[in-house]
From Swiss-Prot:
Keyword tags: Cytoplasm, Elongation factor, Protein biosynthesis
Protein name: Elongation factor Ts
InterPro entries xref list: EF-Ts_dimer_sf, Transl_elong_EFTs/EF1B, Transl_elong_EFTs/EF1B_dimer, Transl_elong_Ts_CS, UBA-like_sf
GO molecular function, one term: translation elongation factor activity
Gene assigned in the entry: tsf
Organism lineage: Bacteria, Pseudomonadati, Campylobacterota, Epsilonproteobacteria, Campylobacterales
Organism: Campylobacter jejuni subsp. jejuni serotype O:2 (strain ATCC 700819 / NCTC 11168)
Length: 357
């Protein structure tokens, strides 16, 4: 019988990441054969992983990988059962390695990922070994990659706690403008992480959805106005009820009508026509802002920029286009939040203990 030394246990533990007693028992069962002990731990670990597979994994981390040339950006979400494990160094390394693997192999689906090879083994087996070592069910829930086209650029941002990740892609009219836009895209990703827009622009909104939201907006404002009339607080005047909710509704005819109305008002005020061109753009912008509240709530381009709330994201991009000397068009963005849409399982401690008996 081979003597099992502390050094042997330490070596096996460092190699497999398994617990100290598990390593000692594995070495004892295999008469000190290191390779057989590794295999035995894998076999036992895989058994544990299978048991854990039915546990709900709703915690975890989002990871972002941007290629060095800013032509590819990948975001992934890997779930664990507890927030504690999500802070584990080994789990953090797993998320980063998996995201890099997805990007470098241009993987398109979770099924494709599981059948791919990482570090010489099938990813599915690799993940099971990580489950056995870490001790919780781990699930690669989703991932996506954005690629830059000709004269395009991508970037990404991961919030410091790893719970929110964003990737974004833009098309530019030159490689020079694309290169200059890298930092801007990262800042817009930070905005997205904070403000969570649901759409890129008003053009992506469905008209029926807009019309229904307009009715809800009017009802909400009228209810608030009723309360303000009751309180009679001079510091809280009644809301102005908008005619529309989105630029999606502002046809050329409606904009033309609004402009003509502004001209009539200026004429009635006795403003000389020679200064109208200086006044009309600002009043038209106010008209559009008043009648696009849905856009500022739900769309990236219509939201006020978190780093300068006097301007919309669209206006910030327009300023950068002038500064960089070319066009910048946001093509797509993707935002992942850990556990988004998953129902977290809650149990009291007594129930948890009882479930294990």
């Amino acid at each position: 019988m081979t003597e099992i030394t502390a050094a042997m246990v330490k070596e096996l533990r460092e190699s497999t990441g398994a617990g100290m007693m598990d390593c000692k028992n594995a070495l004892s069962e295999t008469n000190g054969d290191f390779d057989k002990a590794v295999q035995l731990l894998r076999e036992k670990g895989l058994g544990k992983a299978a048991k854990k597979a039915d546990r709900l994994a709703a915690e975890g981390l989002v990871s972002v990988k941007v290629s060095d040339d800013f032509t590819s950006a990948t975001v992934s979400e890997i779930n664990s059962e507890t927030d504690f494990v999500a802070k584990n160094d080994q789990f953090i390394a797993l998320t980063k390695d998996t995201t890099a693997h997805i990007q470098s192999n241009s993987l398109q689906s979770v099924e494709e990922l599981h059948s791919s090879t990482i570090n010489g083994v099938k990813f599915e087996e690799y993940l099971k070994s990580q489950i056995a070592t870490i001790g919780e069910n781990l699930v690669v829930r989703r991932f996506a990659t954005l690629k830059a086209g000709a004269n395009g650029v991508v970037n990404g941002y991961i919030h410091t706690n790893g719970r929110v990740g964003v990737v974004i892609a833009a098309a530019c009219d030159s490689a020079e403008v694309a290169s200059k836009s890298r930092d801007l895209l990262r800042q817009i990703c930070m905005h997205i992480a904070a403000m969570r827009p649901s759409y890129l622009s008003y053009e992506d909104l469905d008209m029926t959805f807009v019309e229904n939201e307009y009715k809800a907006l009017v009802a909400e404002l009228e209810k608030e106005n009723e309360e303000r009339r009751r309180l009679k607080d001079p510091n809280k005047p009644e809301h102005k009820i908008p005619q529309f909710a989105s630029r999606k509704q502002l046809s050329d005819a409606i904009l033309k009508e609004a402009e003509e109305k502004i001209k009539e008002e200026l004429k009635a005020q006795g403003k000389p026509e020679k200064i109208w061109d200086n006044i009309i753009p600002g009043k038209m912008n106010s008209f559009i802002a008043d009648n696009s509240q849905l856009d500022s709530k739900l769309t990236l381009m219509g939201q006020f920029y978190v780093m300068d709330d006097k301007k919309t994201v669209e206006q910030v991009i327009a300023e950068k286009e002038k500064e960089f000397g070319g066009k910048i068009k946001i093509v797509e963005f993707i935002c992942f939040e850990v556990g988004e849409g998953l129902e977290k399982k809650t149990e009291d401690f007594a129930a948890e203990v009882a479930a294990q008996l």
